[in-house]
From Swiss-Prot:
ATP binds at G172, G173, A174, G175, V176, G177, K178, T179. CDD domains: ATP-synt_F1_beta_C, ATP-synt_F1_beta_N, F1-ATPase_beta_CD. PANTHER family: ATP SYNTHASE, ATP SYNTHASE SUBUNIT BETA, MITOCHONDRIAL. Keywords: ATP synthesis, ATP-binding, CF(1), Chloroplast, Hydrogen ion transport, Ion transport, Membrane, Nucleotide-binding, Plastid, Thylakoid, Translocase, Transport. It is found in: Plastid, Chloroplast thylakoid membrane. It is a peripheral membrane protein. NCBIfam families: atpD (TIGR01039). Belongs to the ATPase alpha/beta chains family. Produces ATP from ADP in the presence of a proton gradient across the membrane. The catalytic sites are hosted primarily by the beta subunits. One of its GO terms (biological process) is proton motive force-driven mitochondrial ATP synthesis. This is ATP synthase subunit beta, chloroplastic.
Length: 498
């Protein structure tokens, strides 16, 4: 059911008329609050604690009701630090779930989980707000069209293409390039598609959040002169926040994206970095609420929590939300319950490989582990499908031969296998690409490669037309013409050395 956003906003002035309770217990970020008989707040209602701490500093903490304990008590999780709270403090029931600002006023701004601006650029128009908890669109409202979303990144567009209005997961351990890939996608999509994006920073590094903001201002995604012309809204609940904020910040970002889809009827991009931190925060809250842990210590409600978020990220007849989610894989174990639960919801998976990153091949996307439901001849066409399959077959054969090469050496292979290995090594290097957002680190200008150019390049390598070129000519270039030009430059350099 579609819920129309409220235009009232839960202002402080209206709080005084609500139910009043008192704190009876504080355990870290969890509060137990006693209310008068018959005046219990509902589950997910926002509670506000206002007062002064022992030093006289004002306190304003918002909590969310999670459990009704009996004996007129509720258990709530705080969305900010509980420092300075004491037993007996007054708690106000707002009578509604957390609501956040939505619409054009959010563009170019940074918000916290409560929808409060944290970028020191003044207040935001809060006349139009929307509750962060709502049901997913009904089946009859969903759109089922299938079309490809071009990213300009060769390995993605060829081997695991993204669906417009789909859900994409970037899987990888620590330090293999998930955040850089997300930043490149934001950059390419803002330039090539001109769409509106919402970025949800869930439990990641504050430094990365700041870097992303500065990067967006430099690239023009956020318009410094006229903020309203910006193309992105940012919502952060970073590593230093309590688990309640990290658990709900994804819903805040999603609520803003839903408004652009349902009311403005736009195609929206929702970036979540990192969806694992959403699960991790849920696990922390679950333990604090006293629930019995499930497999590997995760919360027993893992699938339900993930489903309630993911099912709202969808395309309706009004507009679409294409979601790109970074998924941290603990200890590089894809069978861990958190990444395994996420897999079930995705249309495409981009798996980042530590082995490729160690070889210096960036983006370190594993061409054999990455998958997409879109890679079918009826969707992408015969030419694209055939090229992708032949690339995968060549790389798979190279993988099978690696043990033999390690033991016996290249010379022991048949002529055909040696040719396969040579082409596979060229393909592996041609799958690398210089990024716009990494220019400052590498000094190489970024490249956007169209799908047609990508297919043409790999067809030329597979056909054997470029067998004479050295493999380093294919490393960190854009299209195939740049590779041939680089080969000529390398040849000239070698001749000069002689």
């Amino acid at each position: 059911m579609k819920i129309n956003p409220t235009t009232s906003g839960s202002g402080v002035s209206t709080l005084e008329k609500k139910n009043m309770g008192r704190i009876v217990q504080i355990i870290g970020p969890v509060l137990d609050v006693a209310f008068p008989a018959g005046k219990m707040p509902n589950i997910y209602n926002a509670l506000v604690v206002k007062g002064r701490d022992t030093v006289g500093q004002p306190i304003n903490v918002t909590c969310e009701v999670q459990q009704l304990l009996g004996n007129n008590r509720v258990r709530a999780v705080a969305m900010s630090s509980t420092d300075g709270l004491t037993r007996g403090m007054e708690v106000i029931d707002t009578g509604a779930p957390l609501s956040v600002p939505v619409g054009g006023a959010t563009l170019g701004r940074i918000f916290n989980v409560l929808g409060e601006p944290v970028d020191n650029l003044g207040a935001v128009d809060t006349r139009t707000t929307s509750p962060i908890h709502r049901s997913a669109p009904a089946f009859i409202q969903l759109d089922t069209k299938l079309s490809i979303f071009e990213t300009g990144i060769k390995v993605v567009d060829l081997l695991a293409p993204y669906r417009r209005g789909g859900k994409i997961g970037l899987f990888g351990g620590a330090g293999v390039g998930k955040t850089v890939l997300i930043m490149e996608l934001i950059n390419n999509i803002a330039k090539a598609h001109g769409g509106v994006s919402v970025f949800g920073g869930v439990g990641e590094r504050t430094r990365e959040g700041n870097d992303l903001y500065m990067e967006m201002k430099e690239s023009g995604v956020i318009n410094k002169e006229n903020i309203a012309e910006s193309k992105v809204a940012l919502v952060y609940g970073q590593m230093n926040e309590p688990p309640g904020a990290r658990m709900r910040v994804g819903l805040t970002a999603l609520t803003m994206a839903e408004y652009f889809r349902d009311v403005n009827e736009q195609d929206v991009l929702l970036f979540i970095d990192n969806i694992f931190r959403f699960v991790q925060a849920g696990s922390e809250v679950s333990a604090l609420l006293g629930r019995m842990p499930s497999a590997v210590g995760y919360q027993p409600t893992l699938s339900t929590e993930m489903g309630s978020l993911q099912e709202r990220i969808t395309s309706t007849k009004e507009g679409s939300i294409t979601s790109i989610q970074a998924v941290y894989v603990p200890a590089d174990d894809l069978t861990d319950p958190a990444p395994a639960t996420t897999f079930a919801h995705l249309d495409a998976t981009t798996v980042l490989s530590r082995g490729l990153a160690a070889k210096g091949i960036y983006p370190a996307v594993d061409p054999l582990d990455s998958t997409s439901t879109m890679l079918q001849p009826r969707i992408v066409g015969e030419e694209h499908y055939e090229t992708a399959q032949r690339v995968k077959q060549t790389l798979q054969r190279y993988k099978e031969l690696q043990d033999i090469i390690a033991i016996l050496g290249l010379d022991e292979l048949s002529e055909e296998d040696r040719l396969t290995v040579a082409r596979a090594r060229k393909i592996e290097r041609f799958l690398s690409q210089p990024f716009f957002v990494a220019e400052v680190f590498t000094g190489s200008p970024g490249k956007y490669v169209g799908l047609a150019e990508t297919i043409r390049g790999f067809q030329l390598i597979l056909s054997g037309e470029l067998d004479s070129l050295p493999e380093q000519a294919f490393y960190l270039v854009g299209n195939i013409d740049e590779a041939t030009a680089k080969a000529m430059n390398l040849e000239m350099e070698n001749n000069l050395k002689k």
